[in-house]
A protein has these predicted regions:
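Nucleic acid-binding interface residues in structured DNA/RNA-binding domains
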Residues: 1-104
Length: 104
């Protein structure tokens, strides 16, 4: 059985649109737990349904790609994001253009 926190985090991540990313901290805040970025990382690490919960769309606070448990790891994560149209500046995501800005 999943905790209410896990269920909420998964729902937030499921709502990140293709071509956009959210930071771990942003997901934590949207889930009602500001400051719980590391806990969001734990939820993403145990995600088994990457189609319903696109954990590759969750990134570090600076736009840096962080761990990814599938395929070739971060290399696979970057390729998936590029295919979705996410823009990069060097090795980091350009959060000004590809950062998700959900409706308040």
């Amino acid at each position: 059985m999943k905790s209410p926190f896990t269920t909420t985090v998964r729902a937030v991540v499921a709502s990140i649109p293709k071509g956009k990313v959210a930071t771990y901290g942003q997901v934590a805040a949207l889930a009602g737990h500001p400051g719980a970025a590391r806990a969001v990382g734990m939820v993403m690490r145990t995600n088994k349904d990457t189609k319903a919960v696109p954990c590759h769309r969750v990134v570090g606070s600076t736009g840096a790609l962080t761990g990814y448990a599938y395929g070739d790891g971060v290399k696979s994560k970057k390729l998936m994001l590029e295919r979705e149209g996410v823009t990069f500046k060097g090795d980091k995501i350009d959060l000004s253009t590809s950062g998700w800005k959900p409706m308040a």
